[in-house]
């Protein structure tokens, strides 16, 4: 079995070869941790965003959208805490000259211990079969108990250090547990220090009159400072939400794993405003609702899990991540946070403007509490792409690479393929494509043999191929090929719109959420 890192490299190469993701500025040797989306990637990305947007704003009468500016008044970032607290604990290895997040190194060590425990459990389950009692095994096996004790002690020290913001203790943990640099294999570490992640620039026509501004590190603050505008003009009543999709920027020192961690990325965020005291009810609601949204895609329920935060952000009183099993392990794709009334209260304090809501049912005014759902578009893209990629053995030495995208997310919904480039078949193919293109992303592919064209469409995840042959000219029927099964059926060309609408419509996906 190929190593997971080799599988991931193959997936990344496929993304580039078939027009999904390119290294930005590639002809100038690229720019680290910055990527461009190609012709197929932008379609997949837009479909993911549309699925999220409609699940938020169409399925919820009390959620509306905005699009706030990237540049905002610099005092906003002072009020939000980003100027003082938006830092990562970084550590360098003197031998490899590489820089790492200290907390991630320790989290990876905890994950390694978890893997050892799980391997012991898996071996025992295989040995004992149906008679295996996992709970009893975990509670009594000496090796498992030894690993678990080490894991619990490490986890407790790590949690205490993070909550106390104790950088010296973070380094001591790395030394005590003999955590080595993954490249050099050495333990020659520097001290841990904090690094602010915001990009800073200037706005103004002259150097003397310029104002320091920041590229926003998150989209949430654009929602908070527009809370009053939306609430008043939309006559919104608590509880209600504001959704936004937009770019954010972080000067990630440790940017890695392709588009998983980038310096320029896109977020889909929704801030849900609730009564104080009801935040945990709504936190639980959105925690479950967001996981349901992910699982509706059919990528595999076992690939998802919750990860509750040990250390809470400065604004939160509850937080959990939805993690997805990437080729490089379970990683966060979405965060759900109870942000209390921190943000609105801070903006009320720093702006001097009253940011409160009068609740007619309670006959009182208050600063609303906020439940946030925040998902990285690029991470979502990567989770979909990785889970849908398959190098399939068809037998007799034949293989194909296929992307099993959910049909509603596929960049190209159907391809019309004339069997040969003569006898009026290309013209008929164009006629069919022209009818379908108003409702579906549809392309005509004439080059190469029909088999090669099928493989090409499989490689970009096209759910259906429509083959036009000589019989089409006689009775107006075409061959409809299904991507995942490769099965073919004969259908009337006039029925294609109806058939495709049932198979690839986003509505069919959204209805699973009701």
Whereabouts are the PLM-identified features?
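NTP/phosphate- and nucleic-acid-binding module
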Residues: 1-514
